[in-house]
Amino acid sequence: MPKVAILIYSVDDIIATLAENEKKGIEIAGGEAEIFQVPDVSYKTEYATEEGKEAAKVAKTNADFSYKILTRETLVEYDYYLFGIPTKFGNFPAEWKSFWDSNTGGLWAKGSLHGKIAGLFVSGAISGKGDTEMCIMNAMSTLVHHGVIYVPLGYKNAYKELTDVEDVNGSCAWGAGCVSGIDGGRPPSLSELRVHQLQGKAFYDRIKDL
């Protein structure tokens, strides 16, 4: 049975909540998944303001989840990944970028991740697909350099939710997503949570026969 690693960065509960729904979708399909958290660096940098350091500590303290820390060994151990990314200016946040740059150069040189399979889910501040789609496309540059095969969400399994113009939904064909609001205060809607479950299920259905 293939086992999926759901790899996230989440200082609040939004990406973590989405990850739990991706996991639920995998379990509905008969699979197993474990969630790992990227180490937080935002309050450790010497360039952070005192206000920024305190805000990051508070956000980290208030987060209502606890997962194992993601390491380079995790990437080697698992063959299937779902990456959860909170969009920052249409790209990885610093924590994700720091993890890739600091931990995976040797893996890239050895081709250790080549041929592994991944999907992506994201959160973005505002309604509209631009920032979340751009985040996924930019993240794919890293995956491509490592030779990781990307599996998009597409429209087949979530057509109703992706084409509904009456309900705000941060998902797109590239991957499931949610609109979190400028201050991160908007929780995922039932429609958005459903799309994440559908993506988890579809992803596992795709890999289980490989």
Swiss-Prot record:
Q: Which InterPro entries match?
A: Flavodoxin/NO_synth, Flavoprotein-like_sf, FMN_Rdtase-like_dom
Q: Which UniProt keywords apply?
A: Cytoplasm, Membrane
Q: Where in the cell is it found?
A: Cytoplasm; Membrane raft
UniProt domain Flavodoxin-like: residue ranges: 4-203
Q: Which Pfam families match?
A: FMN_red (PF03358)
Q: Which GO terms describe its cellular component?
A: cytoplasm; eisosome; membrane; membrane raft
Q: Name one GO molecular function term.
A: FMN binding
A Gene Ontology biological process in which this protein takes part is: positive regulation of ferroptosis
**What more does the entry say?**
Present with 7060 molecules/cell in log phase SD medium.
Report the sequence similarity comment from the record: Belongs to the WrbA family.
This protein's name? Protein RFS1
Q: Which organism is it from?
A: Saccharomyces cerevisiae (strain ATCC 204508 / S288c)
